[in-house]
């Protein structure tokens, strides 16, 4: 299955240890999404629409109230990229 360039970028970041944290409003609806690198830096470029697409693809999931992490399916979807470190 092909995924977009932005989805690819976020999944690659998450495969390296990144996470997605959500904030909810008083009605328990998601109001904001934040993506953090493994070093703890905030990564811009993740919005609610992209979050929902990744969740619909089952590329990310949360367990036990923890931040969203990449799944096995997400690892299969992401193509290998050279690490620039």
Swiss-Prot record:
Family label: Belongs to the UPF0386 family.
NCBIfam families: PRK13687.1
Name of the molecule in the record: UPF0386 protein RL2079
UniProt-listed Pfam families: YjhX_toxin
Origin superkingdom: Bacteria
């Amino acid at each position: 299955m092909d995924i977009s360039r932005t989805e690819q970028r976020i999944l690659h970041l998450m495969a390296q240890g990144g996470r997605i944290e959500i904030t909810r409003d008083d009605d328990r609806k998601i109001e904001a999404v934040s993506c953090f690198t493994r070093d703890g830096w905030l990564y811009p470029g993740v919005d609610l629409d992209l979050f929902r697409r990744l969740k619909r693809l089952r590329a990310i999931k949360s367990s036990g109230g923890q931040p969203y992490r990449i799944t096995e399916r997400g690892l299969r979807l992401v193509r290998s990229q050279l690490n620039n470190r």
